[in-house]
């Protein structure tokens, strides 16, 4: 029984569950998608909130440049490159034996400074927002001051009386632990069994307390939440429900618009933009997709990609039960090499907020992630961690889908030929050489 209903009844009502339970790569194109002008109201946040977050990051830029010299060239703004990957596109055409019209680009959040993943957006933003609240309330800075003063010993001593806590499969903990420690906070990261050892080691090297669990992500989050509950000096970063995290990710969209403009890429109804976002609990891709819908409206089509063993958002939105169901309820084990996506229960906040804004969801098996990892390195010389490749099959899934999605959305052959597909590469820039070598060897063996 699942939520009081026999499994057979679930399968009768939701036939796509059969593929999810069998761990078969599958896709579902959302029939409930609505015009963005209407569906954006579901989120409970708006353009003014994203602009406020962007302004906050601007205020902190002098401090970031001071604490992290690698950001000095961008003036303390944490941003990633946008690159066309035409050779990888050609390799995918061969790999999938399909034409795959349009152009293919890669958003390299894998190489964001400070923590080398998309979590350098939301995670760092939430810690900065919390630090700003404390600093303003306690007279450490004023809104118009130079925030680099927060690196001074008296400010660090003040922050040392406060703790930041988070539950993570790895990358979120890495970003929050590093920025928290850099500001002077005590930081504790509750890490699930999936977390890579090198990420734990890196955090400890920064003076962060790492608490390890034999269980999965949801348990780590719950323990982190419990630690913070009774302590007014502890701020818990709630990856399942945080609006600050969500807004930190959403800021990416306006910056991407500038990068697309600079590259001469049009985005409108005749030149659609498809953005393929790896999804774990949902905060990162949800926030980015929200920002994209604000920036491009119905001209952008956002799709979430998940491992076959951890399809939590697909499951939650498809059944309409969101965080009430986990993949484990259906006998799916939530064990995947895509450690950043190893989440069994989705964010109910993101699922409900975004369910009418997302075009679809698809799953990818681990072997395919490794093949694509090796294929990208072979064709473009770009190295990513497995979870960052989840969006790479998206161009083929959209082109070949049999569910009437393209017709429903008015995606004619001419529009698909004019399309830009953007794979959001979420992590991998800080993977140790030996570990990356093992990833590549596994991928090459599967390809050859």
Curated annotation (Swiss-Prot):
Required co-factors: pyridoxal 5'-phosphate
Lyase recorded as keyword: yes
A single GO BP: isoleucine biosynthetic process
Catalysed reactions, semicolon-separated: D-serine = pyruvate + NH4(+)
Highest taxon of the lineage: Bacteria
Xref: Pfam families: PALP
Keywords: Lyase, Pyridoxal phosphate
GO MF terms, alphabetically ordered: D-serine ammonia-lyase activity; hydro-lyase activity; pyridoxal phosphate binding
EC number(s) given by UniProt: 4.3.1.18
Modified residues (N6-(pyridoxal phosphate)lysine): 119
Similarity comment: Belongs to the serine/threonine dehydratase family. DsdA subfamily.
This protein's name: Probable D-serine dehydratase
Organism: Pseudomonas paraeruginosa (strain DSM 24068 / PA7) (Pseudomonas aeruginosa (strain PA7))
Lineage: Bacteria, Pseudomonadati, Pseudomonadota, Gammaproteobacteria, Pseudomonadales
């Amino acid at each position: 029984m699942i939520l009081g209903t026999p499994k057979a009844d679930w399968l009768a009502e939701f036939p796509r569950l059969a593929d999810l339970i069998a761990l078969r790569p599958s896709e579902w194109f959302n029939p409930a998608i609505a015009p963005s002008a209407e569906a954006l109201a579901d989120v409970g946040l708006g353009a003014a909130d994203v602009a406020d977050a962007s302004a906050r990051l601007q205020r902190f830029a002098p401090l970031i440049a001071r604490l992290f010299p690698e950001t000095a060239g961008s003036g303390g703004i944490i941003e990633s490159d946008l690159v066309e990957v035409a050779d990888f596109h050609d390799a995918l055409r061969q790999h999938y034996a399909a034409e795959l019209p349009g152009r293919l680009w890669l958003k390299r959040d894998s190489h964001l400074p400070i923590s080398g993943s998309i979590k350098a957006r939301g995670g760092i933003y939430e810690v900065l927002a919390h630090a700003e609240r404390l600093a303003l309330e306690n007279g450490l800075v004023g809104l118009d001051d130079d925030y680099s003063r927060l690196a001074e010993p008296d400010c660090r001593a003040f922050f040392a009386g406060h703790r930041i806590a988070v539950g993570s499969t790895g990358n979120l903990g890495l970003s929050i632990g590093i920025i928290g420690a850099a500001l002077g906070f005590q930081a504790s990261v509750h890490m699930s069994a999936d977390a890579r050892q090198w990420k734990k080691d890196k955090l400890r090297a920064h003076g962060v307390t790492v608490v390890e669990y034999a269980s999965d992500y949801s348990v780590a989050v719950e323990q982190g939440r419990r630690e913070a509950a009774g302590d007014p000096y502890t701020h818990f970063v709630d990856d399942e429900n945080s609006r600050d995290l969500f807004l930190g990710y959403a800021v990416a969209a306006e910056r991407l618009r500038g990068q697309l403009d600079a590259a001469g890429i049009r985005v409108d109804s005749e030149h659609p933009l498809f953005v393929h976002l790896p999804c774990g609990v949902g905060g990162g891709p949800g926030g980015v997709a929200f920002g994209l819908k604000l920036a491009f409206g119905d001209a952008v089509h956002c799709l979430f990609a998940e491992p076959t063993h951890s399809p939590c958002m697909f499951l939650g939105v498809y059944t309409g039960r969101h965080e009430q169901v986990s993949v484990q309820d259906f006998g799916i084990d939530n064990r995947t090499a895509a450690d950043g996506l190893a989440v069994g229960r989705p964010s109910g906040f993101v699922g409900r907020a975004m369910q009418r804004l997302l075009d679809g969801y698809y799953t990818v098996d681990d072997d395919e992630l490794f093949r694509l990892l090796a294929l990208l390195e072979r064709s473009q010389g770009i190295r990513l961690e497995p979870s960052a490749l989840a969006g790479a099959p998206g161009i083929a899934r959209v082109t070949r889908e049999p569910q009437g999605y393209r017709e429903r959305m008015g995606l004619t052959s001419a529009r698909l030929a004019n399309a830009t597909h953007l794979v959001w590469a979420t992590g991998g820039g800080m993977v140790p050489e030996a570990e990356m070598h093992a990833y590549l060897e596994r991928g090459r063996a599967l390809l050859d």
